[in-house]
Amino acid sequence: MLIIDGKKVSLDLKNELKASVDNFRSITGKVPGLTVIIVGQDPASQVYVRNKAKTCKEIGMISTVIEMADDTTEKHLIETIHKLNNDPTVHGILVQQPLPKQIDEFAVTLAIDPSKDVDGFHPENLGRLVMGHLDKCFVSCTPYGILELLGRYNIETRGKHCVVVGRSNIVGKPMANLMLQKLDATNCTVTICHSATKNIPFYTLQADILIAAIGKAGFITADMVKPGAVVIDVGINRIEDPSTKSGYRLVGDVDFEAVSTVASAMTPVPGGVGPMTIAMLLKNTLQSFQRINNL
């Protein structure tokens, strides 16, 4: 079975992005800038933001983190976003989720200029994705990362049956729409399964490409997978494990050990889809920089 190594691909991609950033710096004297806003003290969010900032700096981009208190008002957050929208040195704006309950996440998403929405969450970017205008939008980073993996591993997708398990706005919905497009690593027949789907194995057993993004540890078992299928595991779930120093370990939505005896190729957890998400965020930021500067 082939292991689809997101850690390696993300490293290759980051090296490519660094070379591009260095080239644009020598030509224009400018570099891409990403600003991340974090509201509150959520530990997981703080880790994610630190990782994004660290990777950003490693490839030569300007990274700015704006920290706001838990009691920040929606009005203040949106005013800050509007200032960033008008700042020519900022090419990507990301508001780390989740947000405190007094803030409407959708209102915040709408406040971000679509041309700087490098997370790909703005309805304008999602609409352009659905219509196939991928050269004029930003694709949500996790689906975009999966597309990159499929392409770099030369996974045959044209005319294949892709089943996406999960319908979140961040992964499931954009992933399904992406796999419908007429691209080298897409052009599939697509089925979406979700919490109200009856007899999910009936659909997953038909999948040539199975993408699991349901948020349940080990949900996809070997008897749900068609022999020879390509399995992409988006899930990141923390489960107790007394044998580890931390007392827990990370697993995906797929029972990796069992499914690896059936699948032809799989992404591991950790080290599969996860590392690609930040890499694609930076790729989107570079694309924004190029568009804004007509490069």
From Swiss-Prot:
Catalyses which reaction(s): (6R)-5,10-methylene-5,6,7,8-tetrahydrofolate + NADP(+) = (6R)-5,10-methenyltetrahydrofolate + NADPH; (6R)-5,10-methenyltetrahydrofolate + H2O = (6R)-10-formyltetrahydrofolate + H(+)
InterPro entries: Aminoacid_DH-like_N_sf (IPR046346), NAD(P)-bd_dom_sf (IPR036291), THF_DH/CycHdrlase (IPR000672), THF_DH/CycHdrlase_cat_dom (IPR020630), THF_DH/CycHdrlase_CS (IPR020867), THF_DH/CycHdrlase_NAD-bd_dom (IPR020631)
Pathway(s) per entry: One-carbon metabolism; tetrahydrofolate interconversion
Swiss-Prot/TrEMBL keywords: Amino-acid biosynthesis, Histidine biosynthesis, Hydrolase, Methionine biosynthesis, Multifunctional enzyme, NADP, One-carbon metabolism, Oxidoreductase, Purine biosynthesis
Annotated EC: 1.5.1.5, 3.5.4.9
Binding site for NADP(+): G166, R167, S168, S195, I236
GO molecular function, one term: methylenetetrahydrofolate dehydrogenase (NADP+) activity
GO biological process, one term: L-histidine biosynthetic process
GO cellular component, one term: cytosol
CDD domains named among the record's database cross-references: NAD_bind_m-THF_DH_Cyclohyd
Family: Belongs to the tetrahydrofolate dehydrogenase/cyclohydrolase family.
Function: Catalyzes the oxidation of 5,10-methylenetetrahydrofolate to 5,10-methenyltetrahydrofolate and then the hydrolysis of 5,10-methenyltetrahydrofolate to 10-formyltetrahydrofolate.
Quaternary structure and interacting proteins, as annotated: Homodimer.
Name assigned to this protein: Bifunctional protein FolD
Biological source species: Pelodictyon phaeoclathratiforme (strain DSM 5477 / BU-1)
